[in-house]
Amino acid sequence: MKIEKKIWKIWSTHPTNDRKGYRLTELLAKGSLLVARKELNRAYEIFSQIILADPSWFEAWNKRATVLYMMGKYEYSQKDINQVLKLEKRHFGALSGQGLVQTELKNYEKAINSYKKVQKIYPSMQAPKVMISHLKELIKGQSI
């Protein structure tokens, strides 16, 4: 868990150590606070602003994907997740989010594949194991 926290801290800090990087890091933190407060429209605007300023910062895409998921805009969330994974293919948070999105879209096999990728990257994470088991039960229930 300590390593996971360090990874999230790294991902949530803009990779440049200049004024722009500090400003974008602060904006990401502000957007994350808005998400916690369920002020999703404002958070969406902030993450979009960060993406415009630096489209290569995958964590801004990931945060916006989370907001879109929370808004029930699953297809748009998936598009942002695709961008995250294009920029950082080992982003276990985005892969987990993809599993959630695909579950909502009832694409259970795709969701399972996403969670299997998470397991390869982060074997000690428990949520993917639980979700895979749950999804397999859903698939079984559909075939009856």
Model regions: which residues?
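Alpha-solenoid helical repeat scaffolds
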Residues: K5-W8, S48, N82, K116
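Alpha-helical junction/boundary sensor with strong preference for TPR arrays
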Residues: W11-H14, D54, E88, Y122
